Swiss-Prot record:
Binds 1 zinc ion. Keywords: ATP-binding, DNA-binding, Metal-binding, Nucleotide-binding, Repressor, Transcription, Transcription regulation, Zinc, Zinc-finger. Residues 49-139 form the ATP-cone domain. Negatively regulates transcription of bacterial ribonucleotide reductase nrd genes and operons by binding to NrdR-boxes. GO terms for molecular function: ATP binding; DNA binding; zinc ion binding. GO terms for biological process: negative regulation of DNA-templated transcription. This is Transcriptional repressor NrdR. It comes from Paracidovorax citrulli (strain AAC00-1). Its cofactor is Zn(2+). It comes from the Bacteria.
Length: 149
């Protein structure tokens, strides 16, 4: 692997560890030219289903969109990045287990809402109010009442 510091084409693996959950491998590498060390992560490459939008367009699955949705909903909420990553991984696992080539964006939205509801009720309400496109206060109030139960 090329060194990110000096671009030397060869580096040596000096340490390898499997993550606690076994999902990826962490490697410490050292450059033979500049002697600097850096870390790489290896995880299996998987093929997610394409996402079918409301208007019928088909786009590639994009993890960063999930991260963005969680970040907005959880802004200034007491939820760690580890918890967010775990929630996203659960969603991705469900998408892969569907075994389908396409998934509706609404299905992904429902999975996000389910995970947010477990993580933080306020974030769940924030996301749901935008996702479900509430048009009046009564819809909002009904959701809050549902969460309180």
């Amino acid at each position: 692997m090329k060194c990110p510091f000096c671009s030397h084409p060869e580096t040596q693996v000096v340490e390898t560890r499997v993550a606690e959950d076994g999902d990826f491998v962490r490697r410490r590498r050292q450059c033979g030219a500049c002697d600097k060390r850096f870390t790489t992560y290896e995880r299996p490459e998987v093929s997610f289903p394409n996402v079918v939008k409301k208007d019928g367009r088909r786009i590639e699955y994009d993890r960063s969109k999930l991260i963005g949705s969680f970040s907005i909903a959880l802004r200034k909420r007491p939820v760690s990045t580890t918890q967010i990553d775990s929630a996203i991984e659960r969603i991705e696992e469900k998408l892969l287990n569907l075994g389908q080539r396409e998934v509706l964006s609404s299905r992904i939205g429902e999975l996000v809402m389910r995970e947010l509801k477990k993580l933080d009720k306020v974030a769940y309400i924030r996301f749901a109010s935008v996702y479900r496109n509430f048009e009046d206060i009564d819809e909002f109030r009904a959701l809050v009442d549902e969460v309180r139960k």
